Structure formats: structure tokens, C-alpha cells
């Protein structure tokens, strides 16, 4: 595993997989948008089939644009077509599970992922979601929504997953990375 910063670095390290974790891209939107070299390299990696996984803030970075609370809009990677918009209230919080509706980078159709969501933003996608998500308590479904988007070899969602809870997620991701070699 090689660390890199989409904010500070100008070049992607040589890799077959990219993991863009959570964070607060809205606090660095201008800098992320201004790093044209990194955005260009990330798009080129996607075109080559590099397996890209992004969660929460990573989803916002892979989107087309990010609108911060002041109303300013910044261009992002445009790998997952859609628009992120920051709000002032918590949009979703807590543990949930999601069932893949089609093949994704981390799951085959029908497989379940468990994770946690915590975000103040909304993502308005240009393509259909690939996960059916739900929040349950005491065996009762409290909420249901659609989430997660797949674009070629890239998958992004608000869901923060833990690979140890379902090791097959990592197996799916590794298989996708091998296809890009």
C-alpha cells in the first residue's frame, strides 16, 4: 500500500488499485479542484481500468462537481457522474446494510455489505444506484434508500465498509485489479 494525497501530490503512484477514503473534501474543494495534474492522472487510471474504490468523501471527489455550503461549485474528477452538495444538517448517520443490485467492484448481485454512513452532503447521480440500502433496528426496517454508483472499474458510495466483516469484498476488488494488468 502506497499513500498519496489528492490535494498535495501531483502524480499518482504506480498502482493497480486506488482507495479514496472518507474525509472532508468540502474543506479543501478549491485545492482539490485546482490540482489538475492529479485529476488528469486519476481519470487516465480509470480509463486504463485501475480498480478504484471511494467512500463518502471519496465519492464526492470522484463526482462531477462539489458545491460547498457557500454555494461555490468546484469541478472534481467526473468519474462517477453526479453532483455533491453540502448541507448544514446531518443527512445520514449510523450503521446500515446494502445489497448489490448488480456486479460492483466489491460485491456480486445479491451480496450484502455492512457499514456506517456519516455525512452532511447529498449526491445527485446521473446514473442509477447499484445498492439497495437499509437501516434496521431490532429486526425492523427504519429507512430504505438507493446508493452506491459503479462506473467502469470505479465504485463509490457513502458507505464506510470494514473488509474484515466480509472478506469477499476484498477478493472482488483484487480480481478487478488483476484484470487491469
Where is each model-derived feature located?
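Structured core elements
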Residues: 1-3, 19, 54, 61, ...
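Acidic, glycine-rich loop-and-beta core segments that form the ion-binding/anion-interacting portion
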Residues: 1-42
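Cysteine-nucleophile active-site neighborhood
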Residues: 25-105
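Glycine-rich, charged/polar anion/phosphate-binding loops
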Residues: 2-8, 62-64, 99-103, 141-144
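Short acidic (Asp/Glu) and glycine-rich catalytic loops that position anionic groups and cofactors
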Residues: 18-24, 58, 152-154
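Amide-donor transfer/coupling interface in amidating biosynthetic enzymes
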Residues: 86-181
Amino acid at each position: 500500500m502506497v499513500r498519496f494525497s489528492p490535494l498535495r501530490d501531483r502524480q499518482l503512484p504506480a498502482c493497480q488499485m486506488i482507495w479514496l477514503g472518507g474525509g472532508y473534501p468540502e474543506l479543501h474543494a478549491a485545492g482539490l479542484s485546482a490540482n489538475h495534474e492529479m485529476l488528469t492522472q486519476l481519470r487516465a487510471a480509470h480509463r486504463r481500468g485501475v480498480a478504484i474504490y471511494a467512500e463518502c468523501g471519496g465519492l464526492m471527489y470522484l463526482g462531477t462537481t462539489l458545491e460547498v455550503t457557500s454555494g461555490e461549485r468546484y469541478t472534481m474528477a467526473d468519474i462517477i457522474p453526479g453532483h455533491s452538495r453540502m448541507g448544514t444538517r446531518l443527512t445520514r448517520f449510523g450503521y446500515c446494510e446494502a445489497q448489490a443490485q448488480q456486479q460492483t467492484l466489491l460485491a456480486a448481485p445479491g451480496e450484502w455489505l455492512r457499514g456506517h454512513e456519516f455525512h452532511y452532503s447529498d449526491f445527485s447521480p446521473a446514473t442509477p444506484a447499484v445498492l439497495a440500502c437499509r437501516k434496521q433496528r431490532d429486526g425492523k426496517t427504519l429507512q430504505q434508500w438507493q446508493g452506491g454508483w459503479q462506473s467502469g472499474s470505479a465504485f463509490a458510495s457513502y458507505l464506510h465498509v470494514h473488509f474484515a466483516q466480509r472478506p469477499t469484498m476484498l477478493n472482488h476488488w483484487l480480481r478487478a485489479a488483476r484484470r487491469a494488468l
